[in-house]
Amino acid sequence: MPIWYLAGILLALCTGIRIGELCALQWESVSTNDKAIRIAKALQRLHDTSVSQGARTRIVIGPPKSDTSVRTIPMTEYATGLCRRMKPQSSAAYVLTGTEAFMEPRTLQYRLEKYTQACGLEGVHFHTLRHTFATRAVEVGFEVKSLSEILGHTSVTITLDRYVHASLELKRDNMQKLKVVGL
């Protein structure tokens, strides 16, 4: 497995970053000293209505999904260490390639599907990493407002309704907390 793809997959799992944000992420936006990633751009494939034949889409790097998607994501020690080991000389290099050429989201999605299928996992998409990050963050006790900001959501309702999946174990743990109040 190429190290850049693996690093991108692990970074997404550690931060909840969107695929388009990761594909547009350059090393100049990663600070291992501050242990943070600054999200200010996203890469997306758009339909090009001006083309009648041939390639009907084009790649655009622009602002992320919403105003709240422009954010700083703190990194774990693991993610920071990974970035320190990976960082190339050029700060203009993209995180996923180590060069000044970006990787398309569908290429990264294709690679992830191949790797997970080789591990016997079916139906894993890149967005699954974001869901997993959010669910695990809640399980370890993240405050939902902070998690919502890390994910770049416009409201905590989006975070709770779409990304947080309560497990039976978490429900049991929460029920046991009632012992504290004598119930």
Where are the regions a protein language model picked out?
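Secondary-structure transition/turn motif
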Residues: R38-R45, E139
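Active-site/catalytic core of tyrosine-dependent DNA strand-transfer enzymes
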Residues: A42-Q53, P74-E122
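Short, contiguous acidic/charged loop-to-helix segments that flank catalytic cores in large enzymes
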Residues: P2, V60-V70, L96-M103, G120-T128, ...
